[in-house]
Amino acid sequence: MAEHHLSRFARDRYLLESLRFAAIQDARRVAAQMDVSAADLYALGLIDEALRTLLQRQAAPAQMTNAASFLDQSLGADPVRATQLTFVSEFPTTSVYRGEVSPVEYLHREEGKGAKEEEKEKHSRALSLRGEIVSLEELLLVNLHNGNPAATTLTPLFDDAPLEETAYEKMIEGLGKYFRDLGIGDQAGESLIDMLRAPARASPHSLAGQLEYIIARWGDVLGADFVTRLLRGLDFVKEEVKRFGVGGPGGETPVPTYFGEPEYERYSPDKEWMPRLVLIAKNTYVWLEQLSRKHQRWIQTLDQIPDEELDILRDRGFTGLWLIGLWERSRASQKIKQRMGQEDAVASAYSLYSYDIANDLGGWEALNNLRSRAWQRGIRLSADMVPNHMGIDSQWVIEHPDWFLSLPYPPYPSYNFNSEDLSDDSRVGIFLEDHYYNHSDASVVFKRVDYQTSDYQTRYIYHGNDGTSFPWNDTAQLDYSKAEVREAVIQTILHVARNFPVIRFDAAMTLAKKHIQRLWFPEPGAGGAIPSRAEHGMTRSEFDAAIPQEFWREVVDRVAAEVPDTLLLAEAFWLLEGYFVRTLGMHRVYNSAFMHMLRDEDNAKYRTAIKNTLEFDPQILKRYVNFMNNPDEKTAVEQFGDGDKYFGVATVLATLPGLPMFGHGQIEGFREKYGMEFRKPKWDELSNEGLIRGHEWKIFPLLHRRYLFADVENFFLYDLFTANGAVDENVFAYSNVHGDQRGLVLYHNRFADTRGWIKTSAAYLDKGSGELRQKSLAEALGLPFEGYVIFKDYVTHLEYIRSCEELWQKGLYVELHAYQHHVFMDWQFVDDERWGKIHFALNGAGVESMSAKWEEMFGVKAEAVEEDVRVKMPRKKAAGKKEERRKKAAVKKPAKNKKPATKSSLAKHSEGAKGKKTAMRKPAGKSNASKGSKAQKTSSTKTKSVKSAKRFQALLGHSRKSIVEGKGLSRDEFWRNVGGGVYEQKQPPSLRVAEKQKRYRRKAQKH
């Protein structure tokens, strides 16, 4: 095999024998001596090898011999031989460099003499060439490297300056002419030398770009094995960029889409309490310190948390308490943070020693006490589980070092481990890489020394890492390619589940199969996420053999079987949210888009995200965890302020389907971001009493009504159409229904004013039919076609009245100022012409009490009676004497002994009521009991009306379905026959009430 001709200077200085490196580690060693990029050095070696292979395949031995003869004839044999002698002297092979062969002897010997027999067969071409022919190839390759702008920093390896006084340049020109005339090249009119220079021309300043060019252009020629090595080289380059140019995730928050590879659906079923869970986070040590200050006594353990604090959480509507940092933490982590200047720090909450409750928090006994008292108040405790890694001095690192990803050598020669031993266990030494302490490097490994072995066995264990930023220097990365590790983690999860009904999995996305491989065992060409891991990659088949199924799917199934009634919550990003709940079966998953997009007022993007989810699978929406801050982000008040925008977004948080999660200090308006290593807050902040009162007025009542908003079966999102027909993407309008209770939420997330109509919902997937459907606002809320509806705004606490007919035909007209929001609940249906007068008088305005407004206008209190609120058939006008009697009855005063309704009876709501709602009827002069047979007739009429209504509803459903499916009744026919106008943005001419009532009745009777 031909040797690489490196400069004598490179051999003297760096003891280098070849540009081809058997392992990336060799390239790192040489690069460390040269103070150049190891990735560039390794990439150039691959480029050199690729060009050499192409040269030898394109130019047969006879052609190279003829090329040498051509140079002898055109330039003269003496100048050519002199140039070759100088070249072999300045760029010697190993045998020439060692003095075993002189340059003259080398030029006249057959290359490869003395090679093993199997090598001879493999490299038969090299054996057929004399040294002078091989040196001609090497001369050409040296020229190509010197002319490569991307290889400038590596010039000492092949600097051709010593050849300036020879015929070197003329020989290169002669070779170009010879191969051009011969027609050897990749394209017509291109010489062989032009072809070999193409990668440098295509990507003059990037060796990685040249590798990509070679793969794309000549991959088939070079063969699959060599292409795999080229892809590994690309991965190595990416790793070096990552190592020396690390940055956070940054960038815009992506909008979730669902058009990738098909994924199976396998949701985990919810228990009844799960959709109604409202979670609040508390950094445990910080919270205990704050409680100590508040109550003026030491509160240091979990059992000392006062009952009144749990009462406060219950009264505010919280049903889950996430305690951050309960587990026994790494002592080495605390030492590192204290050495870095945080003298009062504890260890990170995510660098764990073991899954036992920390002793200084009171241990298991204190937890049991708190858990019992919290459960008495309907509050479930939640804890973290950190499956990706353990602390660098954890029990597992001490007792099971083979469970972690490690190497027997440091991956980079520049790493030194001369700092203090961080281990408290005499059996093992733990050493952090020196450059961590002066921030000059972020090592991907730490050193573990086993003092129990005679040779002090040393491992270099990888730190935990998600590939987005620096390694977590107080953690050790578990090796998930090992089945025993996966089982050990699952057993730990089951242990946590037996003690906490809600588990939050930290950084869960790192353990999805594709990300385990991407980060730690990358396929060729897919590496670069974590420095030094490309050389330890696996093919897809190798990886699937090591990890046959998704780890999280196995976890979900095992927990469901062994510890049911446990809610599993995943912190997952990277557009995996839908996959985690729909396919892997997690009950809930983080939705960071909520915080980022509403904060940045990317309203169109967030509305698109909701619409995409509704069109793909609405069930995903109810499994999101929505939040306004989390422990890794700025506080909520820093991001949203403490005014209208904050309360608008908090209202959306409390009323969207999903799990609302409030941050530590969010309600009090605290601005300090608590680090995971904080023992106590560093700022002495006072609670923002105005913000707390605002929550009590606007937010907490909504948390107590989570059952109304938590699910998606009756959730609909609406567009607000402005006067010019455009959709205002800054308005969030949506409704939900639970039983007989209805809720409509409006929020304008922009510093501006807007107005318009809300009528038709966004499309949603009907999973029964597999079709996309829409509903009108009136249909979604189940409103009757006639009469009026009264509802209450839980933001202003005003009551409003609207015409049901208008809501069906036009929708709801709204005007919204900057960051204004409304939550309309307590919907009641009334049917009396005097309510029409109130509706006309108010002209859309709200009042504190509709009962009071009735009394003001008519001098009597309205009477509330229970009435069936299903869609009612419009009553046909009575004729003759019956009509006269009805009119007289309408103006009579109520009986003196009749108890009038109060405001509370009008505005009340009942979660348990089924099919009943408080409604207003016209006051009657006599009770039904005094009317005798007339009461029976009224009852009979009502029964017939209900039956007619059912027939009409069936007809209406058939007609709408026909419109949606494009068959049966046309839109115009629908308007003429049923008069709903649900799907038409443009309303038809209004019909007189009497005509519509006749048509309703006629159509129902015909049906």
Residue positions per predicted region:
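Intrinsically disordered, polybasic Lys/Arg-rich low-complexity tracts
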Residues: 875-961, 965-970, 986, 990-1003
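Carbohydrate-binding surface patches
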Residues: 723-781, 825
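Catalytic domains of carbohydrate-active enzymes, especially glycoside hydrolases
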Residues: 305-330, 337, 495-504
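Alpha-amylase-like alpha-glycosidases and glucanotransferases acting on alpha-linked glucans and related
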Residues: 1-299, 358-372, 376-379, 391-705, ...
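Solvent-exposed beta-strand/loop surfaces of large extracellular or lumenal domains
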Residues: 785-809
